[in-house]
Amino acid sequence: MLPLSLINQGDNVIIVKVRSKVSEKKHLEDMGFIASESIRVISNHGGDVLVELKGTKLAITTEIAAKIFVNIIYDDINQSDKRIVNK
């Protein structure tokens, strides 16, 4: 499990949990950042983290992204399946 702020551009992840104050967590949940949702990281180059969530592109600060914990989804081309990896 890693914070979203450390995930590379192009990676697909599954949200595991959000560690934040209640009001901030509620706001993130309202945006769609809930456990078991998948996210694709579009950009993560210092400033904001740009993600695609449910077909919508969203930008969040690195500080907020550090509070969203995820597992990376790896595609295994040889076996035509996806694997979630806990780190």
Regions found by a protein language model. Give the residues of each.
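Ubiquitin-like/PB1-type beta-grasp interaction modules and other compact soluble beta-rich domains
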Residues: 2-6
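A structural micro-motif recognizing beta-strand termini
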Residues: 17-21, 54
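Short alpha-helix capping/helix-loop boundary micro-motifs
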Residues: 23-27, 44
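C-terminal structural segments of small proteins and small subunits
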Residues: 50-87
